[in-house]
Curated annotation (Swiss-Prot):
<comment type="similarity">
    <text>Belongs to the LacAB/RpiB family.</text>
</comment>
<dbReference type="GO" id="GO:0019512">
    <property type="term" value="P:lactose catabolic process via tagatose-6-phosphate"/>
</dbReference>
<dbReference type="InterPro" id="IPR004784">
    <property type="entry name" value="LacB"/>
</dbReference>
<dbReference type="GO" id="GO:0019316">
    <property type="term" value="P:D-allose catabolic process"/>
</dbReference>
<dbReference type="InterPro" id="IPR036569">
    <property type="entry name" value="RpiB_LacA_LacB_sf"/>
</dbReference>
<protein>
    <recommendedName>
        <fullName>Galactose-6-phosphate isomerase subunit LacB 1</fullName>
        <ecNumber>5.3.1.26</ecNumber>
    </recommendedName>
</protein>
<dbReference type="GO" id="GO:0009052">
    <property type="term" value="P:pentose-phosphate shunt, non-oxidative branch"/>
</dbReference>
<dbReference type="GO" id="GO:0019388">
    <property type="term" value="P:galactose catabolic process"/>
</dbReference>
<keyword id="KW-0423">Lactose metabolism</keyword>
<comment type="subunit">
    <text>Heteromultimeric protein consisting of LacA and LacB.</text>
</comment>
<dbReference type="GO" id="GO:0050044">
    <property type="term" value="F:galactose-6-phosphate isomerase activity"/>
</dbReference>
<dbReference type="GO" id="GO:0004751">
    <property type="term" value="F:ribose-5-phosphate isomerase activity"/>
</dbReference>
<dbReference type="Pfam" id="PF02502">
    <property type="entry name" value="LacAB_rpiB"/>
</dbReference>
<comment type="pathway">
    <text>Carbohydrate metabolism; D-galactose 6-phosphate degradation; D-tagatose 6-phosphate from D-galactose 6-phosphate: step 1/1.</text>
</comment>
<keyword id="KW-0413">Isomerase</keyword>
<dbReference type="InterPro" id="IPR003500">
    <property type="entry name" value="RpiB_LacA_LacB"/>
</dbReference>
Length: 171
């Protein structure tokens, strides 16, 4: 499996630990930087990772910044990306199994390299479990990423809200 990874200057050491971990497990790692502690901007690296995954150059992306919030927002702007900011196993597995996440985001200063590696290992062994319901949700997410008239439609999520009201839809 080819894995794209990127970070900002705040978490270069944590990213390198994750890269070493992935290589030790036999994964091909595409490191999009940054490679040092010189101040830089996380959107650059989120975009690079997202483009690698969206183009098929990588099968999974990992984005890391100090809190994870900034780089995860950046990577999610790349069409075709479904990234989840996670800090625990439950969120990571849900992201993969239910939403077929193709990028995972971390706050390296919050989660730390050891927990990141544990979460990544679990994620790599998890598989998307398609269902009619999550296929529809993923389609709605994909629909939102492109500008279209339906985005301003106040009933865009009506189908899901009605199911919720009837007790048919559960988190």
């Amino acid at each position: 499996m080819k894995i794209a990874i990127g970070c900002d200057h705040i978490v270069t050491n944590e990213k390198m630990a994750v890269v070493d971990f992935l290589k030790s497990k036999g994964y091909e790692v595409q490191d999009y930087g940054t490679y040092d502690h010189v101040r830089t901007h996380y959107p650059i690296y989120g975009k690079k990772v997202g483009e690698a995954v969206a183009s098929g150059k990588a099968e999974l992306g990992i984005c890391i910044c100090g809190t994870g919030v900034g780089i995860n927002n950046a990577v999610n702007k790349v069409p075709g990306i479904r990234s989840a900011l996670v800090r625990d196993m439950t969120s990571a597995l849900y992201a993969k199994e239910e939403l077929n996440a193709n990028v995972i985001g971390f706050g390296g200063k919050i989660t730390g390299e050891l927990l990141m590696c544990d979460i990544i290992e679990a994620l790599l062994h998890a598989e998307y479990k398609p269902s009619e319901e999550n296929k529809k949700l993923i389609a709605k997410i994909a629909h939102v990423e492109s500008k279209n008239d339906n985005q301003t439609n106040p009933d865009f999520f009506k189908e899901f809200l009605e199911k919720w009201d009837r007790g048919e839809y559960h988190d």
